[in-house]
Amino acid sequence: MPIVSESELVAAITRDRAAKKRIALAAACFDVLGMDDVRALQTARAQADRLVVAVLDDGAVRARLGEGRPVVKLEDRAEIVDAVRGVDYVIVCARADVDRLASLLAPDVRA
């Protein structure tokens, strides 16, 4: 599935909830995606029917990891995460928006 907007994500999750699907939400920088990241996403997906992944924007990555980061540009990080088996939806957001997104989606699992 391509990277989605917030409105597209909310609509999709609303349909998934109507179909009684369990939702997991994971959020991270994913700058230089490693096997630990992939395993964490797989673990989250194993606990739910749908996995939403929030890829943090460049400002959030820089604030968390320091100057010179991110190494991988945002669009590539989002596309790489989208390619991980089991990821259903990818959204890009600022760190401050993750809690608001969680309120909107009310995930059953937060990873």
Where are these regions (language model features)?
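Nucleotidyltransferase catalytic core that binds NTPs
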Residues: M1-A111
